Amino acid sequence: MYLHLLKSKIHNAIVTSGDLEYEGSITIDSELLDLAGMIPNEKVLVVNNNNGERFETYIIKGDHGSREIQLNGAAARCALPGDEIIIMTFAVMEEAEARNYKPMVLIVDRHNNPKSRHLVGEQSEPLSN
């Protein structure tokens, strides 16, 4: 049996901008992608902590160090600049692997600076800006 598990997440990111005219996606600072273990074109589930909305899209790599979290296309209607969101990726794995798998969690501050990261169930690793 195959299970869908949380692979990684960027927790409490702040939307910096939106572009309704873009063809779709979420643009994320490449440094944040690397720290969270996410890659361009990966499918994401996004939760808006301000209004409860959930939506799926895919990742576009943003400039390293830009702290950009931009919603593009229709996704720009799901959250406004300043809204707090959680960005999650998932993986499909067999039950035996899933039992020991630990997702990566990247915590960011109100300016999308990386604060800490940890594998679920393990101690947090502080990150300097």
From Swiss-Prot:
Keyword Nucleus: no
Family membership noted in the UniProt record: Belongs to the PanD family.
Assembly notes: Heterooctamer of four alpha and four beta subunits.
UniProt function note: Catalyzes the pyruvoyl-dependent decarboxylation of aspartate to produce beta-alanine.
UniProt-annotated binding residues for substrate: T57, G73, A74, A75
Alphabetical list of NCBIfam families matching this protein: panD
Cofactor note: Binds 1 pyruvoyl group covalently per subunit.
Lyase listed as a keyword: yes
Major localisation: cytoplasm
Annotated EC: 4.1.1.11
Pathway where this protein functions: Cofactor biosynthesis; (R)-pantothenate biosynthesis; beta-alanine from L-aspartate: step 1/1
PANTHER family: ASPARTATE 1-DECARBOXYLASE (PTHR21012:SF0)
Full protein name: Aspartate 1-decarboxylase
Cited Pfam families: Asp_decarbox
Modification after translation: Is synthesized initially as an inactive proenzyme, which is activated by self-cleavage at a specific serine bond to produce a beta-subunit with a hydroxyl group at its C-terminus and an alpha-subunit with a pyruvoyl group at its N-terminus.
Post-translational modification Pyruvic acid (Ser), affected residues: S25
GO biological process: alanine biosynthetic process; pantothenate biosynthetic process
Location(s), subcellular: Cytoplasm
Annotated keywords: Autocatalytic cleavage, Cytoplasm, Decarboxylase, Lyase, Pantothenate biosynthesis, Pyruvate, Schiff base, Zymogen
Catalytic activities: L-aspartate + H(+) = beta-alanine + CO2
Domain of life: Bacteria
One term under GO cellular component: cytosol
Cofactor: pyruvate
UniProt gene name: panD
GO molecular function terms listed in the Swiss-Prot or TrEMBL record: aspartate 1-decarboxylase activity
Catalytic machinery residues: S25, Y58
InterPro entries: Asp_de-COase-like_dom_sf, Asp_decarbox
